[in-house]
């Protein structure tokens, strides 16, 4: 049950009933202040000019027309024409009882769509670094939310497994193998290997010439070069899988659709663009000109799909990927998660793809850009020496720091239990620190803030969950079977109840906008409201009537269930003890 949608539909029907034009604005929002109801409808002001009536008079008519019997206990016109909606405690209690009895918290699935999500997509032959964190975890959170709501999700890990850089890498690996090194040993540290090859390419003319020859051979399908190339791919994918496992994301080998997968189709893409009069020759290259994106002087943007020497570009591969996803995978919607610096490229790519008919009018194509992770100096996050931070090393440090923090707290956990706990807290802290920020903005990386047990952090939410679970242990009850009749007599009980029912609104916003921070904010607000409820509405004290105790226990169980569900969508583990 979606509370926002239910109320919105009721008010839209009421607007039609009072003579408002169809599709009139129907702004419905959550109340921002205690004492002004649970929701607020602000549609009267926008209709004043259209209906030639005072906003308050229109609001009064809406109140008379809207059918909320049994749902709202009171509607109140306030100010110039706001309508404050006070939901019925009995109705809220009934909805919570349905949620308590349902593993899905009484959340209905959406009509199924096929959604392709392109995320993570690291360049192979290098180790994953912190620059891959945001695309990987934001993409995975969106994927899990989509699947939770019933959509068919096709993950596409568009790995960079092709390109001219492989020439120097293959030449360097070939030299290593000829000196009797085993491939796995030579490639044990991909960063060092890449650095060695780059130095040789820049400083040894003979090596650079051989590297260029290897590029030509690789693109020509030479069996020896392909075998060397496959060594890089296998080692790199294994490394990526280890990172995905540490991060608790759902990507597997089956989701890989690297750049090389489209090699066979690149010539066809260019030919089709030429046949449709889109790609034309310019200085020997094949270019699609885009007057829609002209510069200040009126020069159209140039989108190159084939170099003058015959080589193809990332743009060509991206077009082939779009065509494959829409024509073969039949995507209703495609999401691509990359950093904001690629926004113009994907804007141009969509424009070309739509002109070419690679995207049908009813298919949506959305680039979801994100900002950068910054260090304390406000610059892109680097090591102290200015190098790239390996993602696996960052995650290992997070776990070590979490273990150090936990060792300073009083606990009866064993050493092994402490290590398991540190892993959940450390990894969760890194992920949540990122996911809780609006993806379109840059954010500053801080160990102290992300590992804090106070504020909007993963440790705080994980602790809130363990605190709820400790109530059930002390009471000797199984939280999974709790479904007592709920009463909402205390203000804190009702506020918590309304927040429980807003969970699906947060999930839907994540799906619609690709913004997991909305879910993070919701979970933090839920946990904070539970703490207020816990202080004001005791469950374990003597003298509390059994029906009141059971009602509050059921509310607590619902909170635990919602926290665990929401954190699992973010790929963050919960624990029953801390």
UniProtKB/Swiss-Prot annotation:
Record field: catalytic activity: tRNA(Arg) + L-arginine + ATP = L-arginyl-tRNA(Arg) + AMP + diphosphate
Keywords: Aminoacyl-tRNA synthetase, ATP-binding, Cytoplasm, Ligase, Nucleotide-binding, Protein biosynthesis
GO BP field: arginyl-tRNA aminoacylation
Cellular compartment(s): Cytoplasm
Domain of life: Bacteria
Position of sequence motif 'HIGH' region: 122-132
Pfam families: Arg_tRNA_synt_N (PF03485), DALR_1 (PF05746), tRNA-synt_1d (PF00750)
Coiled-coil blocks: none
InterPro entries: aa-tRNA-synth_I_CS, Arg-tRNA-ligase, Arg-tRNA-synth_N, Arg-tRNA-synth_N_sf, ArgRS_core, DALR_anticod-bd, Rossmann-like_a/b/a_fold, tRNAsynth_Ia_anticodon-bd
GO-annotated cellular components: cytoplasm
Protein family per UniProt: Belongs to the class-I aminoacyl-tRNA synthetase family.
Subunit structure: Monomer.
NCBIfam families from the UniProt entry: argS
Name of protein: Arginine--tRNA ligase
UniProt source species: Pseudoalteromonas atlantica (strain T6c / ATCC BAA-1087)
Lineage, opening ranks: Bacteria, Pseudomonadati, Pseudomonadota, Gammaproteobacteria, Alteromonadales
């Amino acid at each position: 049950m979606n509370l926002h949608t239910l109320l919105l539909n009721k008010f839209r029907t009421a607007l039609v009933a009072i003579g408002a034009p169809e599709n009139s604005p129907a702004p419905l929002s959550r109340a921002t202040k205690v004492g002004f109801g649970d929701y607020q409808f602000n549609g009267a002001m926008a209709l004043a000019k259209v209906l030639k009536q005072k906003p308050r008079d229109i609001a009064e008519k809406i109140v008379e027309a809207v059918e909320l019997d049994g749902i709202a206990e009171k509607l109140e016109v306030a100010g110039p024409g706001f309508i404050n909606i006070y939901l019925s405690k009995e109705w809220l209690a009934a909805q919570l009882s349905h949620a308590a009895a349902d593993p899905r918290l009484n959340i209905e699935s959406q009509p199924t769509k096929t959604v392709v999500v392109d995320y993570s997509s690291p360049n192979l032959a290098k180790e994953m670094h912190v620059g891959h964190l945001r695309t990987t975890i934001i993409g995975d959170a969106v994927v899990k939310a989509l699947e939770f709501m019933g959509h068919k999700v096709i993950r596409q890990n568009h790995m960079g497994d092709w390109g001219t850089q492989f020439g120097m890498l293959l030449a360097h690996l070939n030299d290593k193998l000829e000196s009797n090194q085993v491939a796995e040993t030579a490639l044990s540290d991909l960063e060092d290997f890449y650095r060695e090859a780059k130095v040789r390419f820049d400083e040894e003319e003979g090596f650079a010439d051989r590297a260029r020859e290897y590029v030509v051979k690789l693109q020509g399908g030479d069996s020896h070069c392909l075998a060397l190339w496959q060594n890089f791919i296998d080692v790199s994918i294994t490394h990526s899988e280890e990172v995905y496992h540490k991060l608790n994301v759902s990507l597997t080998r089956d989701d890989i659709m690297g750049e090389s997968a489209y090699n066979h189709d690149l010539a066809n893409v260019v030919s089709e663009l030429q046949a449709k009069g889109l790609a034309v020759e310019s200085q020997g290259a094949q270019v699609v000109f885009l007057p829609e994106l002209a510069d200040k002087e009126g020069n159209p943007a140039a989108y190159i799909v084939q170099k003058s020497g015959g080589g193809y570009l990332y743009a060509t591969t991206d077009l082939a990927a779009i065509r494959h996803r829409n024509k073969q995978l039949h995507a209703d919607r495609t999401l691509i998660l990359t950093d904001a610096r690629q926004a113009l490229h994907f804007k141009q790519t969509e424009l070309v793809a739509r002109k070419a008919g690679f995207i049908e009018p009813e298919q949506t194509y959305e680039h979801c850009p994100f900002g950068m992770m910054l260090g304390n100096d406000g610059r892109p996050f680097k090591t102290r020496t200015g190098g790239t931070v390996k993602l696996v090393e960052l995650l290992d440090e997070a776990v070590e720091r979490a273990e150090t923090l936990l060792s300073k707290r009083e606990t009866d956990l064993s050493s092994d239990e402490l290590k398991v706990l540190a892993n959940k807290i450390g990894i969760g802290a890194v992920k949540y620190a990122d996911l809780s920020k609006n993806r379109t903005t840059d954010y500053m990386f801080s160990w102290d803030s992300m590992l804090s047990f106070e504020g909007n952090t993963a440790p705080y939410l994980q602790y809130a969950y363990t605190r709820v679970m400790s109530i059930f242990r002390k009471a000797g009850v199984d939280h999974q079977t709790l479904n007592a009749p709920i009463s909402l007599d205390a203000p804190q009980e009702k506020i918590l109840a309304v927040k429980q029912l807003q969970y699906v609104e947060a999930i839907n916003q994540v799906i619609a906008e690709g913004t997991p921070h909305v879910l993070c904010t919701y979970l933090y607000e839920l946990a904070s409201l539970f703490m207020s409820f816990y202080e004001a509405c005791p469950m374990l004290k003597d003298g509390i009537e059994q029906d009141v105790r059971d009602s509050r226990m059921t509310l607590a169980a619902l909170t635990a269930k919602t926290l665990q569900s929401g954190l699992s969508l973010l790929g963050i583990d919960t624990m029953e003890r801390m």
